[in-house]
């Protein structure tokens, strides 16, 4: 899991930077009474984050072979089975990670910008304890997917977290 998570980190670290900057801009505009501008920043951030996620999803999947080769090649030599496992897990993780986590980062920026940290805590709590651990437990106990189950869990938990955060955002902003 760690290796494919490092690969997806290429995308999510950039998105987290936009999230942090966006939260500051949203907060400043909210504090100045420019709610319309704060919400405009949020929608621009959604477009930037989702676009960045899509571009990086395409690039990372095109170059998955050469990138994972770096992780599958060690002092013991090249391990093609290990590389194939990393690619398989990575493909699931990136599907649920690159674009959905970009959208989620924009939503988190809005919630942080409006001082709604308890709502962000709720969404992130659900990511781990509702969407991740139970699904991983079920896949590992009731299927024969093996390491592939980790990628599926990451994909599902990231998508479900993004859906939840969007619902929370819609309820909060309406």
Residue spans of the language-model regions?
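Small-residue-rich hydrophobic transmembrane alpha-helices
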Residues: 3-58, 62-64, 101-123
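Residue-level recognition of pore/gate-forming positions within transmembrane alpha-helices
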Residues: 6, 53, 128-129, 158
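Short runs within selected transmembrane alpha-helices of multi-pass transporters and secretion channels
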Residues: 12-19, 93-113, 119-128, 135, ...
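Short alpha-helical transmembrane segments in multi-pass integral membrane proteins
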Residues: 26-97, 140-174
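Alpha-helical transmembrane segments of compact multi-pass small-molecule transporters, enriched
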Residues: 70, 131-132
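Transmembrane alpha-helical segments of integral membrane proteins
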Residues: 132-140
């Amino acid at each position: 899991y760690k290796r494919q998570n490092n690969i997806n980190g290429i995308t999510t670290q950039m998105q987290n930077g936009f999230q942090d900057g966006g939260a500051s801009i949203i907060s400043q505009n909210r504090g100045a009474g420019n709610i319309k501008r704060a919400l405009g920043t949020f929608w621009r951030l959604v477009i930037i984050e989702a676009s960045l996620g899509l571009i990086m999803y395409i690039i990372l999947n095109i170059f998955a072979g050469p990138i994972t080769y770096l992780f599958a090649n060690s002092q013991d030599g090249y391990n093609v089975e290990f590389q194939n496992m990393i690619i398989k897990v990575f493909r699931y993780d990136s599907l649920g990670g690159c674009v959905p986590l970009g959208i989620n980062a924009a939503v988190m920026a809005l919630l942080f910008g409006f001082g709604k940290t308890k709502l962000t805590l709720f969404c992130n709590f659900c990511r781990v304890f509702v969407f991740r651990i139970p699904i991983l437990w079920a896949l590992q106990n009731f299927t024969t997917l093996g390491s592939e189950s980790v990628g599926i869990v990451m994909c599902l938990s990231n998508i479900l977290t993004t859906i939840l955060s969007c619902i929370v955002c819609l309820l909060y902003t309406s």
